[in-house]
Every structure is written in structure tokens, then in C-alpha cells.
């Protein structure tokens, strides 16, 4: 993702350069600044209060508001050199959501997990960890979901999100079983 600020004229860009220090920004011939988020540093010099960044001055326009791009505005407040960059929270949330959970699901992997759960080793592992044999309901539902909705990235992300929230709600670890076993052994 690259964020771009475009100026109306090259003269405005040239006049702006004398009032600010910019690091990590590439400047095009068309009069645009481009940078990758997190690499941008801009400091307004003290004498800029009379320059293009007079009190309350605002630069806006920025990349075409595509799904990946961010609409931002840069404001200087009171000539103190502070700049705020505002990014659209909706775009940030969409971007986080698109990278946080996978969009694809491997049906082969789901099938392997299902057969592993039903195997003797899988049942032994379940008995050792949780004190009981398992019916493999999670693996069956994952495999069924993969067969039916495995090619829909939105539904796959929602499924992974639901699984994470369900796992957080249940959170039974082997430590709980061992605590129960110790209390029964001590009686």
C-alpha cells in the first residue's frame, strides 16, 4: 500500500519543500509525495507559520480511495509543527480482517485431521488430554464446511473467526484435567 498526496501545482510543492523536512518519501515530477505507511516522517520548521502550512492549513486528496488505499488528511494545528494523519477506520478494519484470518481452506488437511481424530492414536491423545474419548465433532464439521463452502473466501474467514471465538469461550486445557486428578487422588 502506498499513500500519495497530490498538489495542485509544482510551484506549491517547491515552496513547501523550504518549510518542511521529509524523510522516507519519494517525490514525483507530477508534484506528488508517495510513501509506505510507517516510513513517513515530516517535520514542519518553525518559520512555516507564514508559509503554505499557515494555521489550519490542510492538504487532502490522496490516492484514489481504493479498497487498499487510505484516505488521509494532514493538518497542522497552531504552527507548533504537529501533524495528524487520519486514516479511514473502515479501511483499516477491512485490511486487518483480510489479513488476520485465512481465505482458503484445504479439504485434504481437514480430511487428514478427521481421520487422525478417529484413529487409535487420536482417541488415546484425547483420553490422555481430556480424560475422555472424543466424537470428533469439530473435525467432522470442518470437513463438511470445507466440502460445501471451501471456495468462498468470505465464508471461510467467518468460519475461522467463529472457531477462534468458540475456542476462547471453551478453553479447557490438559491442566484442568490434571488439577481434577490431583484433587481426587488426594482424597
UniProtKB/Swiss-Prot annotation:
The keyword Nucleus appears for this protein: no
Pfam families from the UniProt entry: PANTS-like (PF11326)
Keyword RNA-binding: no
Keywords recorded for this protein, A-Z: Meiosis, Sporulation
Superkingdom of the source species: Eukaryota
UniProt record, GO biological process: ascospore formation; mitochondrion organization
Signal sequence region: none
Function: Involved in sporulation. Required for the full activation of the early meiotic inducer IME1.
Family note: Belongs to the EMI1 family.
Protein name, entry field: Early meiotic induction protein 1
Protein species of origin: Saccharomyces cerevisiae (strain ATCC 204508 / S288c) (Baker's yeast)
